[in-house]
Design a protein with these regions (language model features):
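C-terminal "post-core" interaction segments
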Residues: 1-236
Length: 236
C-alpha cells in the first residue's frame, strides 16, 4: 500500500489544480492508486473562498461544501460538489490546529460533515465570517462583516472553529530522578511551518528520512489510514 502526504500552506485560485498535479505525481511514483491520503492544513491561515471550495470538491462526489448566510438575501450562497473524487473513496485524514483558519476550516468542515475524512489535531481558529471592504470618500475603507460561513450540516465556523474527530495533544514527559540512570526526552515531533509554496507533497511511507518519524501527528495519521484500509479490506 502507498499513502500520500500533501501539505497546503494557503488557498489560492490555483491551489486545486496544483494539488491534483501533486496527487497524480504521487500515484505515478507509487505505480498504483494511493491507498490513503494525509491532507495537512496545520498553520494554514486560509485564502480565497473558491480555492477552498475547489479543493473540497476534489474529494467529494455530491452535496453541499459550504454556504454563506447574511443579513440580506444577496449574501446567501451555497457551493456544492460536482460529482468527482480523485481518490475514488480512499480514506483520508486531515491535520488541523489552532493556526488553521478560514478556508482551511471550510475544507475540514466539509470533509468532516460528509464523513469523507477524519479530522486529527486540535480545535481550529474559528474565523468563519465573510467581510466586505467599502471604500470611503476620504480614502479610508470600512470593513463590514456581511455574512458567516456554515458547514454542510449547518454549523457556524465563526468563533467556534472545527472540533477534530481525534484530539492530538503534545506529549508531556516528566523527568525521571537521576538515580534511576534513565531520562525521558520529549518525543513529540513537530514539523515547522514551511515557507513558500502552496502545495507540498510526498509519499508518507517513503524516503530515507520518513516524515512520520519526525512528525508525531503525521505518524498518527498514517496509523489511522492503515487501520481504516485494514477494516475496509476485512469488511469487503
Amino acid at each position: 500500500n502507498h499513502y500520500g502526504y500533501v501539505r497546503v500552506s494557503q488557498f489560492q485560485s490555483g491551489t486545486s489544480a496544483s494539488l491534483r498535479r501533486q496527487l497524480e505525481r504521487l500515484e505515478e511514483q507509487a505505480g498504483e492508486p494511493l491507498s490513503g491520503l494525509v491532507l495537512d492544513l496545520r498553520n494554514n491561515p486560509g485564502g480565497v473562498l473558491n480555492g477552498a471550495v475547489e479543493v473540497s470538491d476534489l474529494f467529494l462526489r455530491e452535496g453541499v461544501i459550504v454556504s454563506t448566510r447574511g443579513r440580506t438575501a444577496d449574501a446567501d450562497y451555497t457551493f456544492s460538489a460536482t460529482a468527482r473524487d480523485v481518490l475514488d473513496g480512499a480514506p483520508m485524514v486531515v491535520l488541523v490546529n489552532r493556526g488553521s483558519a478560514s478556508a482551511s476550516e471550510i475544507v475540514a468542515g466539509a470533509l468532516q460533515d460528509h464523513g469523507r475524512a477524519l479530522i486529527l489535531g486540535t480545535k481550529t481558529f474559528g474565523k468563519g465570517s465573510v467581510q466586505t471592504i467599502l471604500p470611503m470618500n476620504n480614502g479610508a475603507a470600512l470593513k463590514l462583516t456581511t455574512a458567516r460561513y456554515y458547514t454542510p450540516n449547518g454549523r457556524s465556523i465563526q468563533a467556534t472553529g472545527i472540533e477534530p474527530d481525534i484530539v492530538s495533544r503534545r506529549l508531556q514527559f516528566a523527568e525521571v530522578p537521576a538515580h534511576s540512570g534513565t531520562r525521558e526526552a520529549d518525543l513529540a515531533g513537530h514539523l515547522q511551518n514551511e515557507a513558500a509554496g502552496t502545495v507540498d507533497a510526498t509519499e508518507a511511507a517513503g524516503g530515507s528520512e520518513r516524515l512520520q518519524d519526525r512528525d508525531f501527528e503525521v505518524g498518527e495519521a498514517l496509523n489511522l489510514l492503515k487501520g481504516m484500509v485494514l477494516v475496509r479490506r476485512q469488511a469487503g
